[in-house]
Amino acid sequence: MATAVADRFYTSTVGKKAVMAISGCVLFLFVLGHLIGNLQIYEGPEKLNRYAVFLRSLPALLWTVRVVLLVMLVLHIWSSVQLALRNLEARPIGYIKKKATESSYASRTMYWSGPIILAFVIYHLLDFTFGTVNPHFVVGDVYSNVVASFSVIPVSAFYIFAMLLLGMHLYHGLWSMFQSLGFYHPRYTLALKRVAAVVAILIAAGNISIPVAVMAGVVR
């Protein structure tokens, strides 16, 4: 009985939006925590590398987080794809064109920015976690690996581009999450949009500051 109710809920549009919002919230918390950890690069190699050693000293927790993130990512992508297909099937072409002109740029780019961000995440893991695309990769020396990678202009450019897309994705995603989880009232619409915009800008700017600092010689 409970399984049937859960199945009906998930197959509904409201259910898919809820799953997308909850999984997006978990991924957002990771992005925020990841940024806070990465900003330790400004405190020097010892601080950042010590932080990395601390994380590796907790393998059970680390792998639990990785598994949870992978599950959340799959749910987020699967729900978004299903919602996109459902929207295309339910709306006539004329309505779609009209809706596109009225929607924000961030919302119109959600479905193509997502795959680019996913491609970036895969490259990011190959670069900083596995070291397969970084010829100067040194196991355990996160600081040097970051400097080596971001000293390569195309790598930094791709990272900055991905972070700009992430910022737009976060802005629309946070705003949609407020709506999907019921935190919505016309009186607070502008305030919630501003909160989403400020958070998205701060996260994107914080991430972008790292390759910029490396290329400018501030971090070396």
For each predicted feature, which ranges?
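Membrane-embedded alpha-helical bundles that constitute the cytochrome b-like, heme-associated redox core
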Residues: M1-R220
